[in-house]
Amino acid sequence: MYETRFDIHNIEGDFYNVEAPENNVDSIINVIIGDIVSAKVNIDRSDRSFPANVAKKIEHNMLNSKRRIVLQYKSYSSHIERAYTLAEKNIINGKQSAMELLNGMYCNSLDKYEIDSFEPDIKKVRQHADDIISDVIKQLRKFVYSSANVTQYKEQVEIGLNVVVAHAFVECCVLENPNNATN
């Protein structure tokens, strides 16, 4: 039998050899994803149209490659609304808390691209729109998988992540609202 041995001589900074406490806390987003992925959905891949207000937002933010997650969302839109309604019944401020979390992740992404989150430069947002969405999904993935109540299959979680972020996009918590545009 082989054995791996490590000799650690010096540890600088805080070192905890226990699971992080935030990993033992349930996540509202996981409840939402669980409700979304447990719904029976008929996906029409031939319908690539968007409602006018969503198309306007896609165009305003110049979203390109990540438009596909909005198409994914379209198939699940009624289910996500139902999931948030259920969350609101069971968790005080459930939807608001989830939307605030997603908006915070959006602001973190803006910071990565040196975009002021208080008054975002729409030209810079447009330049990085797809990357910003990807980064929000990445942050949300890390958050979801480190929560205590991950109960779905990985494939379902990945779909749920896309749908939740696309919903936040449609709700104007991620990327910019064309109705607030000055240019």
What residue spans do the PLM features occupy?
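Long, low-complexity, intrinsically disordered terminal regions
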Residues: 35, 39-183
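Long, low-complexity intrinsically disordered regions enriched in small/polar
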Residues: 1-34
